[in-house]
Amino acid sequence: GLAERAELGGVCLNWGCIPTKSLLHTADVMREAMAASELGLEIDKPRFNLKKVVKRSRDVAAQLSGGVSHLMRKNKITIFAGDAIFQNKNTVTVGDDTIIADNIIVATGARARNLPHIQVDGDRIWDARSAMTPTFMPKKLLIIGAGAIGVEFASFYNTLGAKVTLVEVMDQILPAEDSEIADLAKQSFVNQGMEVLTATGVDEVKVTGKTLTATIDGKSRKFDAAILSVGVSGNVEDLGLEAIGVEIERGFISVDEYQQTSVDGVYAIGDVAGVPCLAHKASHEGIIAVEGIVGEMPHPLNKERIPGCTYSHPQVASIGLSEVQAGERGEIKVGRFPLLANGKAVAVNDTEGLVKTIFDASTGALLGAHMIGPGVTEMIQGFAVAIGLETTESELMETIFPHPTLSEAMHESVLSAYGRTINF
């Protein structure tokens, strides 16, 4: 059985990964239309219909949520609509229903964090849900937090014409990414007309009518709206977890390498089980938990082998260790290849980007790969397979990449790490 209090498919499908990709695709098409004259196409200045843009995004989410419902019926899984509460480690109640099970998996996800001095109101101060369903296009938009979510919204709203100010308290935007890639992303966003402030805090936000006044490093600034994207907290409350002894640390459920909590037979997966808060990590954790329950021998999750993607323009994708992290473990070799030297990138008029690879100098093991540019969110899986199979630098160098493709930049980056670059 499955207990769910909202839409099937969770945050990712309904209010996260999927609907935002619809919005960002709209922005990508608009950006290409604006640059069409460079390709010999004469197109009047494109305009957007905000209601239609939002409606398509919601329709996509609804279609896929319906698909999950179909899968539940097809596999004869009983749905209990409502909040599940533990009565003991083998029993939960959902409304008037009592469900007894030998094993229970908690997959309650996470919710956006507020800041003590900034509270989302849905009108002028938005969380991700409000930012996905705007009723107006702000002329001036403040985005607080420049992780993947903040950066994606910055790309969307900037492309559709808002003047975006992106503020991050850390020293770099995209704090989870390699600093060189993050710096390239920041420079690109600035070149696109955004204001990007790092190592900067937002001290106060006040709303007066249709105007929002923010105090940024002591200076008062006016905006039409703000998006708060400063991380998430696990949905651990009101489940009865404490009563049965499940250990919770810093707002997330503690689990072992097989997703087992501190209580035998109770598992946790996904965002509620801690970072990184990524849907593909959640799915894999679900498989690990179920394989363990049915007596198979699952491989534990290796968090250094989880790819991460940011669907901004330019896109960012990575897997493994950053250059700094890898360097702390020993001697490394680093390869770099700019997309400016890639034939396919030149042909499709999208040459902004870099592929960076990091190897263990003694073993040739691929420790990390970091990419920025067109299509990199689709290409990163090649490096994910390589790391998963523990491929060496020589095996990667001997691999034939098709021409002309953007993926050739991956090959050239590997060659670069060993001084064998061909096209740069």
For the regions a protein language model found, what residue spans apply to each?
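A short alpha-helix-loop-beta-strand transition element characteristic
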Residues: 30-48, 111-113, 247-249, 296-305, ...
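Rossmann-like dinucleotide-binding cores of NAD(P)H-dependent redox enzymes
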Residues: 54, 59-69, 133, 138-142, ...
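FAD-site-proximal beta/loop scaffold in flavoenzymes
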Residues: 118-137, 220-300
